[in-house]
């Protein structure tokens, strides 16, 4: 259940109504209904699909574990300690919240759909639409949050006097969610359940978007709009931001005498920018195959839909795209952040023996107040 925009199918010869286009977010697509059905073979029973099912299951389990636990730790620590609430962490919190919701709400249903029931939806229309909508919103929030972080870094390093304040950041965060929620509305509006005959006398209930056949042009226009606004545009903008930042940090001479503190700050900023560029690269590598596959499938369907294992390949490509949330969580929450230290202190405070009384809480807050929320040596203090 990845990006919901690219899954569409035009074939009125099966169970879906003949005046509709089936757009199946749970990985059914433009030419799915055009594939000749073999009465003797169910694609879900092939060895290729079995192998893909294992890969998908492992990936979904990883997302639930890494994104569920990691982002919960980050959110809990951020809620408990005000010192963690700098501009950068507030922007990262958008990623954490969206990925956490997907990990605990969407992934269990996806595990049931892909792995347990092997492409059959058994949870009703409301959950079908809700899960797909939440998954789509999460993708757009993640993309827009990464873009906001890149802009924040650009302003902080290239134009430090113009850096965002908390009021501007709050407006930007609200805009990130508002845009994501609005753009994803079609994924909920057009989502329904569809019964398909996979092999003779065998049916599966698919959860997906059903676009009227006379709205094919609208669907394609909508997909291209989202592709430009939520992939091409952000990637180009982030690339330009980090290119300009790199020029500032690596190729611009620093005037005056460089103290050890200045050199340390410069090294820290360089490492941070390298981390952010790595995250951008991972985002492109994870999502470019999915968008590319979707474009070929929706605009040049004859190139792929006759391939026997085309659907299985699409599931794997989508699985790779979904796994990007794990990379974000590992990089932002567990690798280069002080969040784990604060979370451990919070647990220590909670489980501390009662005879220490209220003093333990005061002592803990006093001690943590001297620990930077984002350490220079860890290269995540970005001011």
From Swiss-Prot:
<feature type="topological domain" description="Extracellular">
    <location>
        <begin position="192"/>
        <end position="222"/>
    </location>
</feature>
<keyword id="KW-1133">Transmembrane helix</keyword>
<comment type="similarity">
    <text>Belongs to the G-protein coupled receptor 1 family.</text>
</comment>
<feature type="transmembrane region" description="Helical; Name=4">
    <location>
        <begin position="171"/>
        <end position="191"/>
    </location>
</feature>
<feature type="transmembrane region" description="Helical; Name=7">
    <location>
        <begin position="313"/>
        <end position="333"/>
    </location>
</feature>
<dbReference type="GO" id="GO:0004983">
    <property type="term" value="F:neuropeptide Y receptor activity"/>
</dbReference>
<feature type="transmembrane region" description="Helical; Name=5">
    <location>
        <begin position="223"/>
        <end position="243"/>
    </location>
</feature>
<feature type="transmembrane region" description="Helical; Name=2">
    <location>
        <begin position="90"/>
        <end position="110"/>
    </location>
</feature>
<dbReference type="GO" id="GO:0032870">
    <property type="term" value="P:cellular response to hormone stimulus"/>
</dbReference>
<feature type="glycosylation site" description="N-linked (GlcNAc...) asparagine">
    <location>
        <position position="7"/>
    </location>
</feature>
<feature type="topological domain" description="Extracellular">
    <location>
        <begin position="294"/>
        <end position="312"/>
    </location>
</feature>
<dbReference type="Pfam" id="PF00001">
    <property type="entry name" value="7tm_1"/>
</dbReference>
<feature type="topological domain" description="Extracellular">
    <location>
        <begin position="111"/>
        <end position="136"/>
    </location>
</feature>
<keyword id="KW-0325">Glycoprotein</keyword>
<comment type="subunit">
    <text>Homodimer.</text>
</comment>
<feature type="topological domain" description="Cytoplasmic">
    <location>
        <begin position="334"/>
        <end position="383"/>
    </location>
</feature>
<feature type="transmembrane region" description="Helical; Name=3">
    <location>
        <begin position="137"/>
        <end position="157"/>
    </location>
</feature>
<dbReference type="GO" id="GO:0007186">
    <property type="term" value="P:G protein-coupled receptor signaling pathway"/>
</dbReference>
<dbReference type="InterPro" id="IPR000276">
    <property type="entry name" value="GPCR_Rhodpsn"/>
</dbReference>
<feature type="transmembrane region" description="Helical; Name=6">
    <location>
        <begin position="273"/>
        <end position="293"/>
    </location>
</feature>
<comment type="function">
    <text>Receptor for prokineticin 2. Exclusively coupled to the G(q) subclass of heteromeric G proteins. Activation leads to mobilization of calcium, stimulation of phosphoinositide turnover and activation of p44/p42 mitogen-activated protein kinase.</text>
</comment>
<feature type="topological domain" description="Cytoplasmic">
    <location>
        <begin position="76"/>
        <end position="89"/>
    </location>
</feature>
<feature type="disulfide bond">
    <location>
        <begin position="128"/>
        <end position="207"/>
    </location>
</feature>
<dbReference type="GO" id="GO:0007623">
    <property type="term" value="P:circadian rhythm"/>
</dbReference>
<dbReference type="InterPro" id="IPR000611">
    <property type="entry name" value="NPY_rcpt"/>
</dbReference>
<keyword id="KW-0807">Transducer</keyword>
<keyword id="KW-0675">Receptor</keyword>
<keyword id="KW-0472">Membrane</keyword>
<dbReference type="GO" id="GO:0005886">
    <property type="term" value="C:plasma membrane"/>
</dbReference>
<keyword id="KW-0812">Transmembrane</keyword>
<dbReference type="InterPro" id="IPR017452">
    <property type="entry name" value="GPCR_Rhodpsn_7TM"/>
</dbReference>
<feature type="topological domain" description="Cytoplasmic">
    <location>
        <begin position="244"/>
        <end position="272"/>
    </location>
</feature>
<feature type="glycosylation site" description="N-linked (GlcNAc...) asparagine">
    <location>
        <position position="27"/>
    </location>
</feature>
<dbReference type="GO" id="GO:0004930">
    <property type="term" value="F:G protein-coupled receptor activity"/>
</dbReference>
<protein>
    <recommendedName>
        <fullName>Prokineticin receptor 2</fullName>
    </recommendedName>
</protein>
<keyword id="KW-1015">Disulfide bond</keyword>
<feature type="topological domain" description="Extracellular">
    <location>
        <begin position="1"/>
        <end position="54"/>
    </location>
</feature>
<feature type="topological domain" description="Cytoplasmic">
    <location>
        <begin position="158"/>
        <end position="170"/>
    </location>
</feature>
<keyword id="KW-1003">Cell membrane</keyword>
<feature type="transmembrane region" description="Helical; Name=1">
    <location>
        <begin position="55"/>
        <end position="75"/>
    </location>
</feature>
<keyword id="KW-0297">G-protein coupled receptor</keyword>
